[in-house]
Amino acid sequence: NPPLVLFSLDKKSTSLQLYKKANHIGINILSNKQKDLSEYFANNKPEWGNVKYFLTNNDIPMIKNSVVNIDCEKIKMINQGDHLIFICKVNKIKIDKNKKPLIYLNSKYIL
């Protein structure tokens, strides 16, 4: 029973093809001090130019100063309506318990 995590992407996402091709995926839970970074990735084609990150052993970029960084291996994709669901096995997880997560709820940030 390896730990699993899942997420979904809209089939219109500019990043969809990258995730479909990837065997290893990085998942980052941003801190409440990273609102600008969240908006950057939400509104632009994701490019890592000025984003501070580190690489995992699998060469997956992880965003520095996040609350959680999860290094995953993709094990399954499921078509569901206008989204594609990714199920991933967690290989390694890094948690900073001193930080609070960034939460987006009902079309606004909760800081």
Language model: regions and residue ranges:
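Basic, polyanion-binding surface patches
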Residues: 1-111
